[in-house]
């Protein structure tokens, strides 16, 4: 056999071996893919879809939810019956083809199975998601229904337990409860007939009406309690108190109290009747008005009770106070009459006392008898309180005025006595001032001093004349006494000033001799000052002239002389 043939045979054998090895490798790879697909199929089939379907089925869906559930359930049935069986067949076919080394067709079957598994996987995910949505939606709807029913049942129980607290509103509340019950029935009917949208709207209305009625029923008992308990009790209390006050001789400015009682009772009945409409804002507003009218009656009674206490106290005090003020006025009149015999008094006091007497007389005529017969009066105590307080205020003003008048007249005699004493003192002082001036041996008396001296003398004579009258004008005496006091004080000051100026001028004129011979200014001032001193008797001008000249040549000399004089000055010995 030739070598060429041998090589050909060897090559063929090698190719067969290689082809076999490649076939074995491909078959193993396909076996692995087929096994993987089988595992995916089993994993999908093992998903708890049946359990989830049974769980949703147990919710007893109705309407559109039930229809949707049936569609998804049927899709799952189709998958389990058809799709999984078809996948199983294709896997079996792929295994056979792979075992017979028909790799191309086997690969096609593997790809087909993989595509089917992908579709099934997506369908199962959609089914499970839809089932979960149905479950959540049903649970949500169930919770809404349960919540609404719980609200209704709680409201029903609350109304039943507190039925006595709703008064005339109970029929309307029952009617509203039946309407809500009807709405729940409509919800069930619509939900069962497959109309979830309208059923949801009806459920919303039923829940809203339940909440609204619950809020109303929470507020009604307080309003009813006012109408059926509080107001009647207060009215009974007022009527009982009113009768008792009438028995105790109370009278009232308001003459329609009985009618007001009746009007309030009618308002209570009317508001109770209107309450059946459940217009709570209007009922509360009317209750407020009723309470205000009741409170106003309480205020009337309390005002009269408080007024009685004050009026009773004042009725006892007024006669005593009036008698006291009247006695004061009589004493004041007598005192003024006594003083009038000796003094000319201001008409103000007499007129004031007459005004007091008029006020006292008016109270005696109009109020005294009322106070003394207080227990028999047929007037409201509030009016009597005002009357008594007005009279007491008048008496207080009268008493205060009496004290002012008394203060004005009580010191008249003292004023006269003091004026006479002052006059004697001032006359003596005038003589002492005159002697004091004479002892100074002045060249003459300044004209301003003479004017002040004679003016003071005239004022003392005027005071003396006034005190010498048969009836003394005490106001004039007081005025003249004050004028004399000021005049004598001014005259004393002027006396000291004149004497000081004259004495210091003499001393400075003598002192100027030191400078006259060589200071022409001092010589000129000396001559001028000497003329003012001896001829014109103007001691102030003379002092100013010579002191100014000396200050120019010897500063401080004037102060030295003034200080020395003040230490040794002689005082007037009164």
From Swiss-Prot:
The chain crosses the membrane at residues 8-26. The keyword DNA damage does not apply. It is found in: Cell membrane. Residues 102-141, 274-350, 459-520 form a coiled coil. It holds the Pfam family EzrA. One of its GO terms (biological process) is division septum assembly. GO terms for cellular component: plasma membrane; septin ring. InterPro entries: EzrA. It is a single-pass membrane protein. Residues 1-7 are extracellular. It comes from the Bacteria. Residues 27-574 are cytoplasmic. HAMAP family: EzrA. Negative regulator of FtsZ ring formation; modulates the frequency and position of FtsZ ring formation. Inhibits FtsZ ring formation at polar sites. Interacts either with FtsZ or with one of its binding partners to promote depolymerization. This is Septation ring formation regulator EzrA. It comes from Streptococcus pyogenes serotype M5 (strain Manfredo). The lineage of its organism: Bacteria, Bacillati, Bacillota, Bacilli, Lactobacillales. The gene is ezrA.
């Amino acid at each position: 056999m030739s070598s060429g043939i041998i090589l050909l045979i060897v090559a063929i054998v090698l190719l067969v071996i290689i082809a076999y090895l490649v076939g074995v490798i491909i078959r193993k790879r396909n076996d692995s893919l087929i096994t993987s697909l089988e595992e995916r199929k089993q994993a999908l089939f093992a998903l708890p879809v049946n359990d989830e379907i049974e769980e949703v089925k147990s919710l007893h869906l109705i309407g559109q939810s039930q229809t949707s559930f049936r569609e998804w359930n049927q899709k799952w049935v189709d998958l389990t019956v058809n799709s999984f069986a078809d996948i199983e067949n294709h896997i079996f076919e792929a295994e056979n083809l792979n075992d017979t080394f028909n790799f191309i067709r086997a690969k096609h079957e593997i790809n087909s199975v993989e595509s089917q598994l992908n579709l099934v996987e997506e369908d199962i995910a959609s089914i499970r998601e839809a089932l979960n949505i149905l479950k959540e939606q049903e649970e949500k709807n169930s919770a809404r229904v349960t919540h609404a029913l719980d609200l209704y049942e709680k409201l029903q129980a609350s109304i039943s337990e507190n039925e006595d607290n709703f008064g005339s509103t109970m029929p309307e509340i029952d009617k509203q409860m039946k309407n809500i019950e009807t709405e729940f029935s409509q919800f069930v009917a619509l939900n069962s007939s497959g109309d979830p949208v309208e059923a949801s709207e009806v459920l919303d209305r039923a829940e809203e009406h339940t909440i609204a009625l619950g809020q109303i029923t929470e507020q009604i008992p307080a309003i009813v309690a006012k109408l059926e308990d509080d107001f009647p009790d207060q009215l009974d209390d007022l009527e009982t108190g009113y009768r008792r006050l009438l028995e105790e001789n109370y009278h009232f400015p308001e003459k329609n109290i009985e009618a007001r009682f009746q009007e309030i009772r009618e308002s209570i009945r009317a508001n109770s009747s209107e309450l059946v409409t459940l217009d709570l804002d209007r009922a509360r507003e009317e209750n407020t008005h009723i309470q205000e009218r009741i409170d106003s009656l309480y205020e009337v009674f309390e005002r009269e009770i408080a007024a009685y206490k004050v009026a009773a106290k004042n009725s006892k005090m007024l006669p005593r106070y009036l008698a006291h003020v009247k006695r004061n006025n009589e004493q004041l009149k007598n005192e003024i009459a006594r003083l009038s015999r000796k003094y000319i008094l201001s008409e103000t006091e007499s007129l004031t006392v007459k005004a007091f007497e008029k006020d006292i007389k008016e109270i005696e005529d109009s109020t005294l008898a009322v106070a003394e017969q207080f227990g028999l009066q047929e007037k409201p105590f509030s009016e009597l309180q005002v009357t008594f307080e007005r009279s007491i205020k008048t008496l207080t003003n009268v008493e205060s005025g009496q004290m002012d008048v008394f203060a004005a007249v009580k010191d008249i005699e003292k004023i006269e006595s003091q004026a006479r004493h002052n006059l004697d003192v001032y006359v003596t002082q005038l003589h002492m001032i005159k002697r004091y001036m004479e002892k100074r041996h002045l060249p003459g008396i300044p004209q301003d001093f003479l004017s002040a001296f004679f003016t003071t003398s005239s004022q003392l004579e005027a005071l003396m004349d006034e005190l010498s009258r048969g009836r003394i004008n005490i106001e004039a005496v007081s005025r003249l006494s004050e004028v004399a006091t000021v005049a004598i004080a001014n005259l004393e000051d002027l006396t000291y000033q004149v004497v000081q100026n004259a004495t210091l001028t003499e001393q400075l004129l003598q002192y100027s001799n030191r400078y006259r011979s060589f200071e022409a200014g001092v010589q000129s001032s000396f001559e001028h000052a000497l003329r003012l001193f001896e001829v014109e008797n103007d001691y102030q001008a003379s002092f100013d002239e010579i002191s100014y000249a000396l200050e120019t040549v010897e500063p401080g000399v004037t102060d030295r002389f003034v200080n020395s004089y003040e230490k040794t000055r002689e005082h007037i010995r009164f």
